């Protein structure tokens, strides 16, 4: 029997959906912008995708380098760097697929959100895929306590920068991106909302 957890790791289910729909194919360069300890990278490393990743936490990058050494030993350690997204040293148009999973909602304010988003978007190749999952207020608009601006206290005890549909659609237009799927939001039992935002970059 196939060990699915060994094959896919803890791959985000909505990112898995992009794989199933053929939008992420073998040989595409994958960049995880805010990779943590690599939960979304196991499959791509195991299947020999060209993989790059950044995270501001040096411990997380050490973990990802160790994971890559085990699953894809031919990838250089320099593919994985301890850097903030808004100060990323990788060049523009680095990847066919750029993943931003549970990252942008850690923005301090709107200026920081914009810097993080623009730092991520520039990495996407023309006609490339941008996959983003982030906290939002969609579906629970009246359940969050404002901390000023777009920062809110959530019922689960966390504090997040929250987007909404008009905010994401405005950025979609500003970035000249093509919305590949309608915005999809999961409400987690009156605790928080997570929205999936998938764009195709223009030529």
What are the roles of these predicted feature ranges?
Residues 1-25, 30-31, 36-87, 130-203:
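Class I (Rossmann-like) S-adenosyl-L-methionine-dependent methyltransferase catalytic domain
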Residues 114-126:
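A short glycine-rich, Lys/Arg-flanked "PGG" loop and its adjoining helix->strand segment in the class I
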Residues 58, 110-114:
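Non-membrane alpha-helical structural segments and their capping/turn regions in soluble enzymes
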Residues 86-98:
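A short acidic, Gly/Pro-enriched loop at the edge of an enzyme's catalytic core
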Residues 97-111:
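A short SAM/SAH-binding and catalytic strip from SAM-dependent methyltransferases
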Residues 104, 116, 136:
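Flexible, active-site-proximal loop/turn residues at the rims of small-molecule/cofactor binding pockets
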